[in-house]
């Protein structure tokens, strides 16, 4: 049985703007009107990673605000979403020099099961000429073994939307790397190396 993880206590999610740096951590990717046809962050999600079971974040006009007391997990959550979900660089996970964050730590902190698979993802949308939108979703899958003290990651990019066109879990169990590749099919790619993933995202 998979141990239940949850959103860190005392953290409130809002898709709005606020400049109170003492209580808020924010991602701001809003574009100017002249650049409105560019991809803009629309949603992000964490599935079975760190203290999360499943959590979706909706951006308002490209902005995301997390409110909470010091130590509630705002900075760690933002670092998991950006930039880590975009480049797969594990060194980006360390919020401060006081605490080094590894993939193994993310998957085993507060979790006592034998093994765990989870996902971190972000979704971008941009308007199309016909009044619709074009989607781009990318993210990282992580597998950890508590008994062997190991963790590995893979990365993916697709034109499909999580929860709309496909799911990252099957009957509550996060997909394996191989199963994800099957689900994405010709509409996406799965990368073993973070460098190849980063190059693809940067195109």
Q: What is the meaning of each model-derived region?
A:
Residues 1-203:
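Extreme N-terminal "head/tail" segments of very large remodeling/mechanoenzyme assemblies
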